[in-house]
Amino acid sequence: MHAPNVAGRRAEREIERVSWRDHHRQSVVMPPTMDTVTRFDDDGLRVVLSSSSVYPESTAAAFALASRLGYHGVEIMVGTDATSADPHALAELASYHQVPVTAIHAPTLLLTQRVWGTDPWAKLERAGEAAATLGAAVVVVHPPFRWQRNYASVFTDGIRRLEANTGLIYAVENMYPWRGPGGGEVRAYAPSWDSSLLDCDHLTLDLSHAAIARQHSVELVRDWGERLAHVHLTDGTDGPTDQHLLPGEGDQDPGAVIDELMRTGYTGQVVAEVSTRGMTRHERAAALKRTLDFIQVRVGLTERPSS
């Protein structure tokens, strides 16, 4: 007898639980076959769905949605649920849905400090191992927190060592200053929340973080040049919280950002990382489809709709 495909059955139950065809009745959406899956060269731009975009639904739901809507891959936010931290379960989900894992977001957030232990270097090494197992090329990393003194003191050297040892891209994400009720800034990251100032070869641009930091994402694309290795496509304003709005709902002009990426010949991943927390499943699917369409039209993968 064959061993049961636990992740596959979990995915089947997830699909059965979510209705895509009809908002009022459930229906089963089977994953595409190998013959129907679009393949992309390693050097080609990919439009990817972050698993955090389906929260509070599960990582399995992210694969189901990515497959259903036509995303090229999934970026895994490690720590959102148990499956996100299990490379073998992720591999089975990727195979079942025929949607590859293209990036691993290491559990270096404030809310994931105890996922994969508490040693930050062990977390990054484990993220690299997961990426290698799953065939992902990118590990997304947040800068150290101020209280992680030893880690922060050798952060950039350690990132270079990891890249040299693994052959992976460890792309450090831009963050933002924390602000108190009176508007004063709290120093939460070291050496800096601004990844522009870090001596790192590869950076991740998050448009929502740029908005809170009162930066302009288009300018960051230009300033970073070849250091820009990964993009979290979203939107935001300079409010007190990290909003991760849908494209066009904030002040970062994500369309202009994509245009600049195309002008510079960017061939990395454009990852939809938006908040759908307050939405129904039907609304979530529609919002992520609109986000996918927005990106694909701007990068020229689909034609603009006729007016």
Predicted regions mapped to residue ranges:
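Short, electropositive alpha-helical surface patch
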Residues: A152-A164, Y266, R281-V299
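Acidic/histidine-rich catalytic cores of soluble enzymes
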Residues: L162-D251
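Conserved, mostly hydrophobic/aromatic
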Residues: A66, V74, A131, Y170, ...
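Active-site acidic/histidine proton-transfer and metal-coordination neighborhood
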Residues: R39, Y96, Q113-H202, P305
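N-terminal pre-domain/capping segments
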Residues: G8, W20-T133, H202, D293-S307
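Acidic-and-aromatic substrate-binding clefts and catalytic sites of carbohydrate-active enzymes
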Residues: S52-T59, I76-A89, L109-P120, F145-A152, ...
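Structural motif
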Residues: L69, T133-L134, E226, T264
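Structural preference for beta-strand elements that scaffold enzyme active sites
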Residues: G44-V48, G73-E75, P100-A103, A137-V140, ...
